[in-house]
Curated annotation (Swiss-Prot):
GO terms for biological process: transport of virus in host, cell to cell. Phosphorylated. Its main location: host cell. This is Movement protein p22. Keywords: Host membrane, Host-virus interaction, Membrane, Phosphoprotein, RNA-binding, Transport, Viral movement protein. GO terms for molecular function: RNA binding.
Amino acid sequence: MDTEYEQVNKPWNELYKETTLGNKLTVNVGMEDQEVPLLPSNFLTKVRVGLSGGYITMRRIRIKIIPLVSRKAGVSGKLYLRDISDTKGRKLHCTESLDLGREIRLTMQHLDFSVSTRSDVPIVFGFEELVSPFLEGRELFSISVRWQFGLSKNCYSLPQSKWKVMYQEDALKVLKPSKKKASKTDSSV
């Protein structure tokens, strides 16, 4: 298998300072390479590749993603690459379940996708099948995404998207409701 996964065990704030999500695909036409930014799935802008003629294929793909989630949250999920030019949003790649409290580094030699060099590159990434040890109901953490386009000095970011989960103590309370003494209260005005 030519796909490698690596998860780096560093605090997220260190990783976040180290790199601000420079997610890029290396595309190839003949002997010529060009980097194309890889966008999050809820960012709708597409990117135009400035090469002349022919088709590009995705190769030497290296993706570095830092979800800003506490390592203590114990949240996992699958990272996917999707073709949004396809009406069904065909999945180009989906990883195994990964710990979202650590940086994800994905390396692939080839991606089964090609597009005309005169068109947009409609590949996005996202997360699915999120698993948490907590029940739904309370805000415990959020995820924020930042990335850069090519060699641009501008940094782009998405607003934080909140995930609702519940503290473990609250989950236990749901399973074992506390016995409350019935007390009468006067509601006289």
